[in-house]
Amino acid sequence: MVVMPPQNSVNESEGRYLQDGFWQHGRFYGSWKPGKYLFPIDSEELNRLDIFHKVFLLARDNKPFLAPIRRTSPRIMDIGTGTGIWAINVAEECLSDAQIMAVDLNQIQPALIPPGFMPKQYDIEEPSWGPLLADCDLIHMRMLLGSIQTDLWPQVYHNAFEHLAPGIGFLEHIEVDWIPRCDDDERPANSAFVKWAELFLDGMDRFNRRVRVTPQEHRQMLEATGFTDIRQEVIKAYVCPWSADRNEREIARWFNIGLSHSLEAMSLKPLIEKLGFEAEEVRELCERAKRETCVLRYHTYCNIHVWTARKPGPQQ
């Protein structure tokens, strides 16, 4: 492992840059609060995050959010913003008069940002979100499983609740369930993708940063926090564009690209550091899984889960 000195931050194209960090397992990781975010922050990873933004847009009728916004000049937070692409999309194309705070451990957002976009480096596992934007109309979170300690999810939901405007503030939370599913048994008996998912989930469990999606548990946590009008939606994302449905094929094309970028990035640390794999063993498994997900006769899919909830007003 080589620690990068401050003067040697890795420059990126498109106005992005990487903060001081370190190379490990052949990838570049952030050095602010190391060990909290287990995935790389190099250019390949930034591309992966942007690809999944496209996946989620396609899966939701090209709408970056569905919650109603009832105030002019709304206040919005994007928790775990990554590259900031969701927040920038909202600022440029949906709500040009909004204040949008884009929160992440790593400052990997572009240098050129729209008015109203406020990047904020912050650890959302902190007990209080005091420095963050309050009285929000919308708090958006996605792909945070694996970035939050398993036992801290009630605290994260509580802090989101506290930072929403009573009566009109909404939370939207999106996650991918990485367990491969198939409704017609059209997948190989000894699936490399299934094996990858089992090992990845196990390794992340051992980090106490679970990525397993438990829909009812999340609903119960939202209810216990005090949210109302809770809605759950499940969207199929096929890993290969075999479907006769045009929209399903388009989602699958982008999901396949995103998945191809995800396999190695997400599983290097859990498989090497918790399950004892060598880096080349991980890459070989990922390559087999990648080839499998490109076979049209295999009808495997992953579920995308969406939770939407509202903070009630004082009289509700």
Curated annotation (Swiss-Prot):
| UniProt KW keywords | Methyltransferase, Nucleus, S-adenosyl-L-methionine, Sporulation, Transcription, Transcription regulation, Transferase
Query: Can you tell me where the transmembrane regions are?
Result: none
Q: GO CC terms for this protein?
A: nucleus
Q: Which reaction does it catalyse?
A: L-methionyl-[protein] + S-adenosyl-L-methionine = S-methyl-L-methionyl-[protein] + S-adenosyl-L-homocysteine
Instruction: Identify which top EC class this enzyme belongs to.
Output: transferase
One MF term in the entry's GO annotations? methyltransferase activity
Do the record's keywords include Cell inner membrane?
no
Q: What happens when the gene is disrupted?
A: Impairs production of bikaverin, fumonisins, fusaric acid, and fusarins.
- Tell me which Pfam families the record gives: Methyltransf_23
- Indicate the family of this protein: Belongs to the methyltransferase superfamily. LaeA methyltransferase family.
Q: How does it assemble?
A: Component of the heterotrimeric velvet complex composed of LAE1, VE1 and VELB; VE1 acting as a bridging protein between LAE1 and VELB.
| The protein's name | Secondary metabolism regulator LAE1
Q: Native species of this protein?
A: Gibberella moniliformis (strain M3125 / FGSC 7600) (Maize ear and stalk rot fungus)
Q: Which gene encodes it?
A: LAE1
